[in-house]
Swiss-Prot record:
Component of the acetyl coenzyme A carboxylase (ACC) complex. First, biotin carboxylase catalyzes the carboxylation of biotin on its carrier protein (BCCP) and then the CO(2) group is transferred by the carboxyltransferase to acetyl-CoA to form malonyl-CoA. Pathway: Lipid metabolism; malonyl-CoA biosynthesis; malonyl-CoA from acetyl-CoA: step 1/1. It catalyses: N(6)-carboxybiotinyl-L-lysyl-[protein] + acetyl-CoA = N(6)-biotinyl-L-lysyl-[protein] + malonyl-CoA. GO terms for molecular function: acetyl-CoA carboxylase activity; ATP binding; carboxyl- or carbamoyltransferase activity. Keywords: ATP-binding, Cytoplasm, Fatty acid biosynthesis, Fatty acid metabolism, Lipid biosynthesis, Lipid metabolism, Nucleotide-binding, Transferase. It comes from Methylococcus capsulatus (strain ATCC 33009 / NCIMB 11132 / Bath). This is Acetyl-coenzyme A carboxylase carboxyl transferase subunit alpha. HAMAP family: AcetylCoA_CT_alpha. Residues 39-293 form the CoA carboxyltransferase C-terminal domain. Its main location: cytoplasm. Belongs to the AccA family. GO terms for cellular component: acetyl-CoA carboxylase complex.
Length: 321
């Protein structure tokens, strides 16, 4: 897979292009230039470390949307076994923007649910760019209730720019579907681990994001609105997106400081798309650890902690009158 580089990665891209050019020269002319290539590879690694050691919130936002970043289905295939997808909300339709089904995690039965964005143009349209409609959230809730009935732990993979704001979605009760999921997930009598793997966009993310543990991949984001949307509202221009990203505190590091997430899953150097297998291994380790810890807790304690966590989001104090 040919790597695609973001604008701020151009110095790295130029160095990688030189390395690739040398490889072709050596192969075509049967010249051993492995030593030169090794030196350039080490230089590229150090440059990547330097660039990624001081990323801005806006740059991290770009990485979270990288076109080659692994999606929910990628992690399902790499982490879980015997995945059997389930379809439909049993009320209106099946929404491809949400995928979910039964699977095994090293032998243990689980239910997995996630947003799915799509890769090429055809699939992106089919998946509605990862923006679920009401039937997607109702499908997710149907599967969660199934998991509760059979005492299966739930893993939710979050990666969406937000819930679909179209007229048809609103007519079918988009806000009710999201609110219903929040209400029901707070009471489900089974462990829930949620992971932001890319974009965590507003209520569209939170609708499958109420759980006992909330993890974020290192270069994922979680916010009430996109930086561009925030900039358009506050400064009347999407050009201020970089400023908005910094002000909103959308990164895993900032949210960890605020106590809104439980842990950060480290990504390979350069981002999850650079080494999907390694990223999946890192996430699998964290999922197993958290599920084992939650399985040891009494259900009453689990539900009380989950409710307290949900009520702690967005707390503010009104000034005395």
């Amino acid at each position: 897979m040919d790597l695609k580089f973001l604008d701020f990665e151009q110095p790295i891209a130029e160095l990688e292009a030189k390395i690739e050019e040398l490889r072709h020269v050596g192969f075509d002319n049967e010249i051993n230039i492995s030593e030169e290539i090794s030196k350039l590879e080490e230089k590229s690694r150090k440059l990547t470390e330097s660039v990624f050691s001081s990323l801005s919130a806006w740059q991290i936002s770009q990485i979270s949307r990288h076109p080659q970043r692994p999606h929910s289905r990628d992690y399902i295939d790499l982490i879980f076994q015997e995945f059997h997808e389930l379809h439909g909300d049993r009320a209106f339709a099946d929404d491809p923007a949400i995928i979910g089904g039964l699977a095994r995690l090293d032998g243990a039965a689980v239910l997995v649910i996630g947003h799915q964005k799509g890769r090429d143009t055809k699939e992106k349209i089919h998946r509605n760019f990862g923006m679920p409609r009401p039937e997607g959230y109702r499908k997710a809730l149907r599967l969660m209730r199934l998991a509760e009935r059979f005492r299966l732990p739930i893993v939710c993979l979050i990666d969406t720019p937000g819930a679909y704001p179209g007229i048809n979605a609103e007519e079918r009760g988009q806000s009710e579907a999201i609110a219903r999921n929040l209400f029901e997930m707070a009471q489900l009598q089974t462990p829930i681990v949620c992971v932001v793997i890319g974009e965590g966009g507003s209520g569209g993310a939170l609708a499958i994001g109420v759980g006992d543990r909330l993890l974020m991949l290192q270069y994922s984001t979680y916010s009430v609105i996109s930086p561009e949307g925030c900039a358009s509202i506050l400064w009347k221009s999407a050009d201020k997106a970089e400023l908005a990203a910094e002000a909103m505190g959308i990164t895993s590091e900032r949210l960890m400081e605020l106590g809104l997430i439980d842990s950060i899953v480290p990504e390979p150097l350069g981002g999850a798309h650079r080494d999907r297998e390694r990223m999946a291994d890192n996430l699998k380790t964290e999922l197993k650890r958290n599920l084992e810890e939650l399985a040891a807790l009494p259900m009453e304690e689990l539900l009380a902690m989950r409710y307290e966590r949900l009520m702690g989001y967005g707390v503010y104090e009104e000034p005395a009158t």
